[in-house]
Amino acid sequence: MDNVEDLRGTLLSAVAEAGDLDALDAIRVSALGKKGQITGLMKTLGAMDPEARKAAGQALNLVKDEIAAALDARKADLAAAALEAKLARERLDVSLAPAPEATGAIHPISQTWEEVVAIFAQMGFEVAEGPEIEDDFHNFTALNFPPGHPARAMHDTFFLPTREDGSRHLLRTHTSPVQIRTMMGRKPPIRILAPGRTYRCDSDMTHTPMFHQFEGLVIDKATHFGHLKGCLHEFVRAYFEVDDLPMRFRPSFFPFTEPSAEVDIGCSRKGGALKIGAGDSWLEILGCGMVHPNVLTACGLDPEEYQGFAFGMGLERIAMLKYGIPDLRTFFESDLRWLRHYGFAALDLPTLHGGLSR
């Protein structure tokens, strides 16, 4: 037992020099394991006389406890050092600029919708809505479409299956049924804007089976074509943000208006680039006219007492013209790159005072 102190010193030095937890565990096994050095000395106590066994046992227990305490302390130090190294590797530099946040963008159709509503709201119009699945009366008959009109054909309109009573519904081909429902449901004066989705059997670079349209309707006792011209002058100049935008009305025909007109705005096509404003070219943007007496009668209004005007245009079309979007189909492709390029800030709401399309 004379070498207990030497063993103690050797083991304490080895514990202090252990560079990692694996080395420390190897020292624990060699000292305190079943075949460890201290364990081996403890097994020799049985061959000693009682007095010597008592003294040697006390000495070995002290060394055993001291080595165990040293192992625990060194293990705690190594664990703390490992944690410190890990934290140093994962340290964040709070002075660095943060990564840019991924933000959404307002779709050009939604932006154009809000711009149009903002302009007409300043003129006293209110937004009216109606169902997208309509019946023949509201979509055609009440709007003075004759029975053989091409719009009633299967190749131009999406019809739903025929019902048991022989009637069949359809996807509305315009938002004009909203006008019909409004005139039948309330008394004049009426001043509404009817934006929404419409459906027609058509698909190419400038047509899609579903598109957005907005229509306006004014009904009162003294409404005339001059009011229509003034209203549309205000709109096109505010929307395209061109104060002196040239504008002309060409005679046309629509079943639901009489007289009817198509509206052109001035533009320039020099160098192959379209520029809205002064120029030697004209660009058609909408249709309009005075509400046909037959339409007023179908809605229960006396055409001798009330007159009105209506107008309509495609949201995609005027968005393409204002924002230089070449292909109508890209509006519906859900391409995030396209939306980042043509989209608008979510909180930048259009107003006439603050600006429509900042």
UniProtKB/Swiss-Prot annotation:
Its cofactor is Mg(2+). PROSITE patterns: AA_TRNA_LIGASE_II. Keywords: Aminoacyl-tRNA synthetase, ATP-binding, Cytoplasm, Ligase, Magnesium, Metal-binding, Nucleotide-binding, Protein biosynthesis. Signal peptide: none annotated. Binds 2 magnesium ions per tetramer. This is Phenylalanine--tRNA ligase alpha subunit. One of its GO terms (cellular component) is cytoplasm. It is an enzyme of class 6 (ligase). Its EC number is 6.1.1.20.
